[in-house]
Amino acid sequence: MSYRYMRMILMFDMPTDTAEERKAYRKFRKFLLSEGFIMHQFSVYSKLLLNHTANTAMVGRLKANNPKKGNITILTVTEKQFARMIYLYGDKNTSIANSEERLVFLGDNYCDED
């Protein structure tokens, strides 16, 4: 069986005016983190998926946990396409992973020197 790694990019916009809306926002964000999503920017998350079947299952779980208010946009790309993403920013941030490697160490504290 061959696997085609995919990356689900999820963008959402939810109101946070009332206490109830903020609670719904926190609940949805907590759900995303529990499902293995990684935050790229505020309200932009991604998750590595094994194949199209895993993608379909994740979409089903997202539909089951869809907040009542707000918009959610999902874009699925191959891992190779995701690795070609271009980051534009001011100071260089080395904690962002953008690689085709299967094992990536996140953060500034990793060093392979002894």
Curated annotation (Swiss-Prot):
The protein's required cofactors: Mg(2+)
InterPro entries, sorted: CRISPR_associated_Cas2, Virulence_VapD/CRISPR_Cas2
Domain of life: Bacteria
UniProt entry keywords in alphabetical sequence: Antiviral defense, Endonuclease, Hydrolase, Magnesium, Metal-binding, Nuclease
Residues at which Mg(2+) binds: D13
Gene3D superfamilies per record: 3.30.70.240
Enzyme Commission code: 3.1.-.-
GO BP of this protein: defense response to virus; maintenance of CRISPR repeat elements
Molecular functions per Gene Ontology: metal ion binding; RNA endonuclease activity
Phenotype of the disrupted gene, per the record: Plasmid transformation is still inhibited.
Reported function: CRISPR (clustered regularly interspaced short palindromic repeat), is an adaptive immune system that provides protection against mobile genetic elements (viruses, transposable elements and conjugative plasmids). CRISPR clusters contain spacers, sequences complementary to antecedent mobile elements, and target invading nucleic acids. CRISPR clusters are transcribed and processed into CRISPR RNA (crRNA). Functions as a ssRNA-specific endoribonuclease. Involved in the integration of spacer DNA into the CRISPR cassette.
Assembly information from the UniProt record: Homodimer, forms a heterotetramer with a Cas1 homodimer.
Family stated for the protein in its record: Belongs to the CRISPR-associated endoribonuclease Cas2 protein family.
The name this protein goes by in its record: CRISPR-associated endoribonuclease Cas2
Gene name linked to the record: cas2
